[in-house]
Amino acid sequence: MIEIRDISKKYRETFVLRHVSTRLPSDRMVAFIGSNGAGKSTMLNIISRLLEPTEGSVSIDGRELRKWDSRELAKTLTILGQTLHTPARLTVEELVRFGRVPHSRGRLENQDSLQIDKALELTEIADLRHCYLDELSGGQRQMAYIAMAIAQDTKYIFLDEPLNNLDMHRAARIMKLLRSLVREQGKTICIVIHDINFVSFYADYVVAFRDGVLCHQGPTEDIIRTDVLRDIYGMDIAIEPYGDKKICVYYE
């Protein structure tokens, strides 16, 4: 379980997060939602130890984040950020291998190769394994980085807008894949995401931010409501039933 206790973050005199406290459920897909600048990515970076909070603390599995050894932490959580730097002469397979570094220390064994092959197959880019990253489309590169995150094979996976640059087919494929990692392997996935219909269909739990404050949280069905979404986004969003799920309509 991830426990967030009274987290605040400010840059100079401006707070981007204010006194956020919550517990993120394990073995679930947790969606961080909210408008641009609400604090979602900042919180994701704090719980992955990429960013130090101004106040407060985070614990993972009962241990304060600051007390984790870096290598042990890298075997426990994966973080895929919004900004991805692309080394020009690196192949897809070479990139995905980096996901195994915390486990192999650079010396790949059979188990590492199996994880790499599995990640390439799951993301449907095995045929691109020998292609250089700078030869790929933005969507294909995004899939390669997601494959790297999957190859790391950690209990916790943190993804900041992983659907960027993906077409509808690939975006839906990735969300289904992430859900299967939760259901079949017991992963805990925290995802920053703007498409609330993907949230409605695939997330188990939602944490919503507004102006740096945690304004709503709970099971997805408790958040996908017109009154709650209006409070989060400041706009009217129609909700229509679709089987046992809900579709949000916000184009009018």
What are these regions (language model features)?
Residues I232-E252:
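ABC ATPase nucleotide-binding domains
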